[in-house]
Amino acid sequence: MLTDPDLPQEFERMSSKRPASPYGETDGEVAMVTSRQKVEEEESERLPAFHLPLHVSFPNKPHSEEFQPVSLLTQETCGPRTPTVQHNTMEVDGNKVMSSLSPYNSSTSPQKAEEGGRQSGESVSSAALGTPERRKGSLADVVDTLKQRKMEELIKNEPEDTPSIEKLLSKDWKDKLLAMGSGNFGEIKGTPESLAEKERQLMGMINQLTSLREQLLAAHDEQKKLAASQIEKQRQQMELAKQQQEQIARQQQQLLQQQHKINLLQQQIQVQGQLPPLMIPVFPPDQRTLAAAAQQGFLLPPGFSYKAGCSDPYPVQLIPTTMAAAAAATPGLGPLQLQQFYAAQLAAMQVSPGGKLLGLPQGNLGAAVSPTSIHTDKSTNSPPPKSKDEVAQPLNLSAKPKTSDGKSPASPTSPHMPALRINSGAGPLKASVPAALASPSARVSTIGYLNDHDAVTKAIQEARQMKEQLRREQQALDGKVAVVNSIGLSNCRTEKEKTTLESLTQQLAVKQNEEGKFSHGMMDFNMSGDSDGSAGVSESRIYRESRGRGSNEPHIKRPMNAFMVWAKDERRKILQAFPDMHNSNISKILGSRWKAMTNLEKQPYYEEQARLSKQHLEKYPDYKYKPRPKRTCLVDGKKLRIGEYKAIMRNRRQEMRQYFNVGQQAQIPIATAGVVYPSAIAMAGMPSPHLPSEHSSVSSSPEPGMPVIQSTYGAKGEEPHIKEEIQAEDINGEIYEEYDEEEEDPDVDYGSDSENHIAGQAN
């Protein structure tokens, strides 16, 4: 890129000598040339000359183009210094054309320039001087010295001039770079609108991030609050449970304290009253009754038993009955009434054949005297209350005859057997219970002794045989009646045909009544059947007559009404809460609840009834309701409806009540039996003393003419109870008619157990 400016000047000087005449020159001219060269050398020493080497990359460019920037640079650098320099520069510019014509202007190295200069110098000197050898040698020496000086100057000035060129080049490069950078920076910087848009986007992103952060903080706070509330709820629940446990513990402690107080009061009453507890024989013992009694804490050790005359095979388990138990059973009685009641009981117990209260010797242990016919009652599901004798006194059975019967139903569903009367003596009974209650010193005749083991065993065997025979005949009779009803009642509906069938049924029952007329009250020791002990009612059998359809015709149930829809779930709930509750009691509860409901509460169940009726009609379009005949029962060969049977039972109970009230008019003023013992259902599971002679019927002993005293145990409140039961059956009658399990069971007793229980008590 850089060229040497001195070589053209040298060529210029050489070429300036070419116009000399070929005819030669004088010595003066040579001297002028040499002096001029010296002056130029001195000027060149004073002013720095630029020695720019030729560059290879410019071989094809014209010489004027190469040296144009150099001349400009020399003008700028030198400035207005001397006219000689200006003259030299102008001379250089003026001789550019000549130098461009030189054949050596394209040389690219200093050696070529020197060779060219030497050749030209030689040619010029030889041509111009034309002198002898002396002049030639001096001119060559001058040229050589000039060349050497020029070379030295070039070598000397090159390191000084190069930095200035580099500075110029670097300045140019910086300017170009700045120009290019400024353009690129403008492109990168962009317009103000784009910057504002980007700023808006950044602000939007910042706002979004801020809102997201706030949301996260709010959610975190909510979670903290929720966790705190849950912890607070758990703490409150734990505190509530703890309080409930503490309350339950306090209640249990209070119950224990009350129980302890009751025990203390019982002991005080026993000590202060000096009243010996009752002693009631149990005839024969039942393991279930003993277990139930043991749970209540009233059972003595099993070894504590007696044998009347060493011949009674049935030991007596003794259970205490105290005034506290009586007070618990009858909270309405005061202390004075309790004293009177116990006085009456002891008076009934302490009647002796000789008129003495406690004066009989100990040797008469075998003579157990009962003022009434000695009987027992066996309950299948309930423990009879039994009392013990005082430990201080021996078991003086003759001084304290057993007159009170043990019967305490534990549940309203437990059927009761009639009493078995065993009389092995010859003397008839001369006095009754009212007489015994009236005076402790009343005399009664002995009716029998329990010292004949053979007689007792024989009576038991006869009772078992007759009961088994009656059961077999009853089964055969039931089969015949069922066949007759299924054949006849499905086809004949006239009164004449019904009368014929009823007479046939009565004839089938005559044999049973003739063969077992005195065995109605016989106790069944093997099975817990329900046997009526009255003379007029023998083995009442309640059954259902068959429907008015063929045996192969499938039974279509009626659609449930609103009450049945409601009672279905309610009955299930009650059974879950009380699994042992009887169906009749559940029906009473449901009936009373349904009556108490308002029409608004019943509305959804009526809607369900309409839906079920529509669905039933779509499923069975030809369905016709055929009501089954009313329930009937056989009483003494007569077929009676349930209402008639209940009316007969009610009348008989009323008669027995009147009979007992007439005999009790002259007695001591104590509470009636119905008040002392409210009812069989209310007394369920409560051990308490009883009045003598609970059950009685026509005796199955060899003396059928013996008078019988009836008790009014559970008499009060029976008629309202029966009315409520009939009413409940009227309400819920459809429920019982729709259950197939009741239809398929031929032995099911459709009278409620509470009805049978009342009937058994009255008879």
Curated annotation (Swiss-Prot):
GO terms for biological process: cartilage condensation; cartilage development; cell fate commitment; central nervous system neuron differentiation; chondrocyte differentiation; in utero embryonic development; negative regulation of DNA-templated transcription; oligodendrocyte differentiation. The modification Phosphothreonine is found at T131, T372. The modification Phosphoserine is found at S21, S370, S411, S414, S439. Pfam families: HMG_box. GO terms for cellular component: nucleus; transcription regulator complex. Induction: Expression is dependent on SOX9. Keywords: Activator, Coiled coil, Differentiation, DNA-binding, Nucleus, Phosphoprotein, Transcription, Transcription regulation. Residues 1-30, 76-139, 369-426, 708-763 are annotated as: Disordered. Disulfide bonds: none annotated. It comes from the Eukaryota. Residues 99-109 have a biased composition (Low complexity). Residues 76-89 have a biased composition (Polar residues). The keyword DNA-binding applies. Disruption phenotype: Newborn mice display mild skeletal abnormalities. Mice lacking both Sox5 and Sox6 develop a severe chondrodysplasia characterized by the virtual absence of cartilage: chondrogenic cells are largely arrested at the stage of chondrogenic mesenchymal condensations. Embryos lacking Sox5 (homozygous knockout) and heterozygous for Sox6 live until birth and show severe growth plate chondrocyte defects. Embryos lacking Sox6 (homozygous knockout) and heterozygous for Sox5 live until birth and show severe growth plate chondrocyte defects. PANTHER family: FI18025P1, TRANSCRIPTION FACTOR SOX-5. Transcription factor involved in chondrocytes differentiation and cartilage formation. Specifically binds the 5'-AACAAT-3' DNA motif present in enhancers and super-enhancers and promotes expression of genes important for chondrogenesis, including cartilage matrix protein-coding genes, such as COL2A1 and AGC1. Forms homodimers and heterodimers with SOX6. This is Transcription factor SOX-5. It comes from Mus musculus. The lineage of its organism: Eukaryota, Metazoa, Chordata, Craniata, Vertebrata. The gene is Sox5.
